[in-house]
UniProtKB/Swiss-Prot annotation:
InterPro entries: PPIase_dom_sf (IPR046357), PPIase_FKBP_dom (IPR001179), Trig_fac (IPR005215), Trigger_fac_C (IPR008880), Trigger_fac_C_sf (IPR037041), Trigger_fac_ribosome-bd_bac (IPR008881), Trigger_fac_ribosome-bd_sf (IPR036611), Trigger_fact/SurA_dom_sf (IPR027304)
PROSITE patterns: FKBP_PPIASE
Record field: catalytic activity: [protein]-peptidylproline (omega=180) = [protein]-peptidylproline (omega=0)
Molecular function terms from GO: peptidyl-prolyl cis-trans isomerase activity; protein folding chaperone; ribosome binding
Start and end residues of each PPIase FKBP-type domain: 160-245
Transmembrane portions of the chain: none
UniProt-recorded name of the protein: Trigger factor
Domain commentary: Consists of 3 domains; the N-terminus binds the ribosome, the middle domain has PPIase activity, while the C-terminus has intrinsic chaperone activity on its own.
Annotated source species: Francisella tularensis subsp. holarctica (strain FTNF002-00 / FTA)
Pfam family, one: FKBP_C
Length: 438
């Protein structure tokens, strides 16, 4: 086998590979003889079909099957010999004739080689959130609202009321697509509508019609409406007032709590503290990763981005429960590209740093992280034992321990400031971020 390495611009190169004719023809001949012993053909007993007839009828197909198996073996050997770190590969067949050498080109995209420096340029704003009894009471109030019952009332609309409305949205005096609806239930203050919409209904009565002016958020998904000033003609058809359940033993049983109200409040606070800790860690980590992407200079392999896009599509399909009849591959790649590029770049940067630093996940650290994570489950000890039996889950935990250590290492060198934030705003931002990332 002859191999010629041709270096190209950036992270690209090609391998021109030539396989001797006798090697290819020998394998093809053996496969034809093997096929002749098993194939059924009219006029011949099983195993007695002449190899010449098999070659005449199936020779081209057999040759292509042999080549399809042989090409990956040959370029894998060449890649190994040349000591190349390959991110992606495309094969181009050049010559394929009986009695002639097989020639093909393996166009390679390599993993970039780079060193990350300038950690002191990274700026991180560390959120500081105080969790007091006030936030705990508000959380319990939110849980009460989830179990609220509603009854019709004849008064003006107030916060927390459920109203049934018709509305017509207009931009520049013309109704816009998706801006008209009838018999829609809206809980005032829930934030289910765009900012300003629910506030505009407060004070209205049943049967009243009113036109309000609202401005769509700048980051609204419909670019035609993003940042646009619009009007909504609203008609109130029904007003219902919420009745919240009392916080008693019967109420707390809905959440699987057996120790009464005091136990319930303690568990709520512990859950809030646990959730807050992980969210704040993620917020800091996201800023660190963003900073790393800004200081690291390298070419991102397109093949890795494409692979990540395909994985994101499959993940979306899984979230949709397999959605019969829905071809996720019909979705445009650019819908996923930005997130995919970020993930690939972050992964490459972390790998680069870990290759130069010795971060290890000690068994005690993995155990401690696992103990913390399983507290969110109904049966922590049972969940813990199940996870410990899953090698993939343990590997993920080890990776998370190392990722946390790496983040702390970067933070020691970065410019870190603190910013006081509200608990519920932090939770809301986290939910929005998760939705944006599918």
């Amino acid at each position: 086998m002859q191999v010629t390495l041709e270096k190209k611009e950036g992270i690209h190169c090609s391998l021109l590979i030539e396989v001797p004719a006798n090697e290819i023809d020998s394998v093809v001949s053996k496969e034809i003889n093997r096929t002749a012993k098993t194939i059924k053909m009219d006029g011949f007993r099983p195993g007695k079909v002449p190899a010449g007839m098999v070659k005449k009828k199936y020779g081209e197909q057999i040759r292509m099957e042999v080549i399809s198996d042989l090409i990956p073996q040959k370029y894998s050997k060449a890649i190994q010999d040349e000591k190349l770190a390959v991110a992606g590969i495309e094969v181009e067949l050049k010559e394929n004739k009986e009695g002639q050498p097989l020639k093909f080109v393996a166009n390679l995209e390599l993993f970039p080689e780079f060193e990350v420096t300038g950690f002191e340029k990274i700026e991180v704003q560390k959120p500081v959130v105080e969790l007091t009894d006030k936030e705990v009471k508000q959380m319990i109030e939110n849980l009460r609202k989830q179990f609220a019952t509603f009854s019709e009332v004849y008064k003006v609309v107030e916060k927390d009321d459920k109203v049934t409305i018709d509305f017509v949205g207009k931009k520049d005096g013309e109704a816009f697509e998706g801006g008209t609806a009838n018999d829609i239930d809206v809980i005032i203050g829930s934030g289910q509508m765009i900012p300003g919409f629910e506030d505009g209904i407060i004070g209205m009565k049943k049967g009243e019609q009113k036109t309000i002016t609202v401005t769509f958020p700048q980051d609204y998904q419909n670019k035609d409406l993003a940042g646009a000033e619009t009007t909504f003609d609203i008609t109130v058809k029904k007003i219902q007032q919420a009745e919240l359940p009392e916080v008693n033993d019967e109420f707390v049983k809905k959440f699987g709590v057996k120790g009464g109200v005091d136990t319930f409040e303690n568990e709520i606070k512990e859950n809030m503290q646990r959730e807050l800790k992980f969210i704040l860690q993620r917020k800091v980590k996201d800023q660190v990763f963003k900073g790393l992407r800004e200081i690291a200079k390298f070419e991102t392999p397109k093949s890795l981005i494409k692979r990540e896009i395909d994985a994101a599509k499959q993940n979306l399909l899984k979230q949709m429960g397999g959605a019969k009849g829905f071809d996720v591959n019909q979705l445009p790649d650019n819908l996923f590209e930005a997130n995919a590029k970020q993930k690939v770049e972050t992964s490459l940067i972390l790998d680069s740093i870990m290759n130069s630093q010795e971060f290890k996940a000690e068994e005690a650290e993995v155990e401690s992280l696992l103990d913390e994570l399983v507290q969110a489950y109904e049966e922590p000890e049972k969940t813990k034992e199940q996870i410990k039996k899953n090698d993939k889950e343990i590997a993920n935990l080890k990776a998370l321990v190392i990722e946390n250590k790496l983040t702390d290492w970067v933070l020691e060198q970065a410019k870190v400031t603190e910013k006081t934030e509200d608990f519920f705003e932090v939770i809301k931002e986290n939910m929005q971020a998760q939705q944006a990332g599918f």
